[in-house]
């Protein structure tokens, strides 16, 4: 039976339309009849009782904003009659609320074991320019090197970016660290680092950011030192292909998987279907000893105390407070309003305030304890749920997840996007209409919730799908040949 509306939490003052509802529709919610006094679009909210001006509006069991006026039962609730209730910097206190997950049966996937013990889910050759001046050269090399994509050489990809020179301070450090992280990513069976020669982030400097690397698989070329950098690079790619082609997939325990979690183009159903399904997936993977990473810090604002209270100890709580407040200070340093969110697309889909968006966004974290807090560019160390410092921008955040060690990124969306990151990026739709309309973008559909599919079923099905991707199944963006990256920029350009 098709479910037409949902009250998410017993304390909620609103319900969410799971399909378009017409004015005059009588909704029976917890034994109470609510007659809609206006049309309600899919993903949008309506009042379950009269709400007074300045009264908090409750959804997910938490306030998502404040009524700007008296709101009548059955009314549409959105930006016209509610506003954010959030302030700037806050003082937080630790109220430990940790739920340990019971271990579950082991599962395996077919991956690549690297010489340093790390695990990859792809066996690709990556071309990484140190500086934006080399982007076109790198792209030309990639295009001409496609003849080497065969057998166990799964792809040859270039990751271009506009940085590597004319940068100072944190920006320069961020660029170097992200490039170093990608150079050492286990999804790359081989890497050509392509430098110009005179840039700030030149190859000699970058080598200081690398750990012990396999010299048979990581090669360097400085273009200013070669008469024909393209032909010489193609020779290096040919040698790398000979090495990479010898790699074989083997059975690996799922406890070694690291999965990034991100949302973008969210709608009013994202926090009800897709994000909770990813949260269930995260708990399932962690119960098997695996690791997940949650980022997009600005979209934690308004829901941060939930994550803080799930920190395993007070030291992690303090790190999470710094994670949140440092990002708020970043906004303030640029004279930007901290809560200038959600986007026009979010609002069209039914998300009204940042609290509304954040409480839906953090559903991806499931119920597991927070075991680690990572700075931008820092690789994950602790198995379990980790928080990562990165902005909400889709490509910047997804690249940060990959740089921190994610083998795969799970990306939920209610509006849709074709983008790809350096690692397989699984697009998960919150509604079936998007899945039907954009099958060339979307890999997994959570819209079945409206048709009666349970969240547990969706999470279990998603887990099986992720194991298949980890074992080599290509996602839609890979089939289209899409790979991309972006680096977080904060400062001046010389």
Segments predicted by a language model, with ranges:
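Metallocofactor- and cofactor-centric catalytic cores in central/energy metabolism, strongly enriched
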Residues: 1-408, 415-418, 423-494
């Amino acid at each position: 039976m098709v479910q037409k509306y949902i009250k998410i939490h017993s304390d909620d003052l609103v319900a969410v339309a799971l399909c378009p509802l017409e004015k005059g529709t009588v909704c029976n919610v917890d034994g109470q009849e609510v007659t809609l006094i206006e049309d309600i679009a899919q993903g949008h909210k309506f009042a379950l009782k009269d709400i007074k001006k300045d009264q908090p509006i409750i959804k997910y069991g938490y306030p998502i904003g404040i009524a700007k006026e008296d709101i009548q039962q059955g009314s549409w609730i959105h930006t016209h009659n509610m506003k954010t209730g959030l302030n700037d910097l806050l003082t937080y206190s630790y109220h430990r609320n940790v739920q340990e997950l019971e271990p579950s049966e082991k599962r395996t996937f077919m991956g690549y074991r690297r010489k340093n013990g790390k695990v990859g889910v792809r066996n690709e050759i990556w071309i990484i320019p140190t500086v934006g001046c080399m982007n076109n050269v790198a792209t030309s090399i990639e295009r001409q090197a496609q003849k080497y994509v065969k057998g166990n050489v799964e792809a040859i990809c270039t990751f271009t970016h506009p940085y590597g020179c004319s940068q100072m301070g944190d920006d320069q450090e961020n660029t170097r660290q992200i490039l170093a992280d990608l150079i050492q990513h286990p999804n790359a069976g081989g890497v050509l680092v392509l430098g110009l020669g005179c840039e700030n982030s030149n190859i000699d400097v970058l080598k200081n950011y690398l750990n012990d690397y396999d010299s048979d698989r990581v090669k360097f070329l400085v273009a200013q030192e070669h008469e024909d950098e393209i032909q010489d690079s193609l020779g290096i790619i040919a040698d790398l292909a000979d090495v990479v082609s010898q790699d074989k997939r083997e059975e690996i325990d799922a406890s070694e998987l690291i999965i990034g979690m991100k949302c973008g183009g969210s709608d009013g159903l994202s926090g009800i279907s897709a994000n909770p399904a990813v949260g269930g997936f995260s708990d399932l993977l962690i119960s098997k000893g695996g690791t997940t990473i949650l980022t997009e810090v600005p979209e934690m604002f308004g829901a941060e105390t939930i994550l803080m209270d799930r920190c395993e100890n007070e030291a992690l709580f303090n790190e999470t407070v710094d994670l949140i407040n440092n990002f708020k200070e970043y906004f303030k340093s640029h004279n930007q309003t901290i809560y200038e969110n959600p986007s026009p697309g979010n609002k069209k889909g039914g998300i009204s305030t940042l609290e509304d968006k954040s409480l839906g966004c953090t559903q991806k974290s499931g119920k597991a304890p927070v075991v680690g807090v990572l700075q931008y560019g820092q690789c994950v160390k602790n198995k379990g749920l980790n928080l990562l410092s990165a902005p909400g921008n889709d490509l910047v955040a997804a690249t940060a997840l990959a740089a921190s060690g994610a083998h795969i990124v799970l990306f939920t969306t209610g509006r849709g996007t074709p983008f790809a990151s350096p690692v397989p990026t699984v697009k998960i739709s919150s509604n079936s209409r998007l899945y039907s309309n954009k099958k060339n973008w979307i890999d997994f559909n959570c819209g079945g919730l409206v048709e009666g599919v349970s969240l547990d079923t969706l999470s279990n099905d998603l887990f099986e799908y992720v194991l298949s991707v980890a074992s080599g199944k290509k996602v839609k963006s890979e089939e289209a040949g899409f790979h991309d990256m972006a680096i977080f920029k904060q400062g001046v350009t010389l």
